[in-house]
């Protein structure tokens, strides 16, 4: 076992995971280095290669395994960790007594949407206490657009007896700035929802490491 890999673990136990640098967290995940490259050095090299933790996590299998020192085993483990994080955030929403934590919602949506290379339009369907009933990817599109049909959203909302909605879609370009069509689409969905006494609580636009909230800007 390498002494370098013990240091981050000891730091985590003493001060908490939040005190660790990204490369230290990755070193704990990797556990060991390779010949002539201790695990700390390896983790730093991995992050430089992929640019960030987000770049590492969003890499596909081929991209991930191209880096010497990490392979299919680490790829599988990382995908499992990422999926567990998504499900944890989903459970946080599902089991919350009331939907009062916009930060949890935003982190969940960023985790779900920002890695897509095509535009995906998702909807969170909430009950009358603003607890999550389900999340559904309603529409998928191209690199810069997705066709969205308010009628389909409302039909699904009525089917699952939702009282409120949170809308979200990603911008693969990386910018979270809403377009004119995003604004118009939101108004159309909100108008259709109001006819059925369903509230639209927010619309998140997810970019690369950034987001835009219609509710935060009082656009709803």
From Swiss-Prot:
Where does the motif JAMM motif lie? 169-182
Can you give the residue ranges of the MPN domain?
Answer: 98-220
Database matches in NCBIfam families: PRK00024.1, radc
Task: Tell me any Pfam family this protein matches.
Answer: RadC
Q: Name one GO molecular function term.
A: metal ion binding
Q: Which keywords does UniProt give here?
A: Hydrolase, Metal-binding, Metalloprotease, Protease, Zinc
The entry's family comment says:
Belongs to the UPF0758 family.
List this protein's GO terms for biological process: proteolysis
Q: What protein name does the entry list?
A: UPF0758 protein Asuc_0013
Residues annotated for Zn(2+) binding in this entry: 169, 171, 182
Name the domain of life.
Answer: Bacteria
Does the record carry Glycoprotein as a key word?
Answer: no
Q: Highest lineage ranks of the organism?
A: Bacteria, Pseudomonadati, Pseudomonadota, Gammaproteobacteria, Pasteurellales
Q: Which InterPro entries match?
A: MPN, RadC_JAB, RuvA_2-like, UPF0758, UPF0758_CS, UPF0758_N
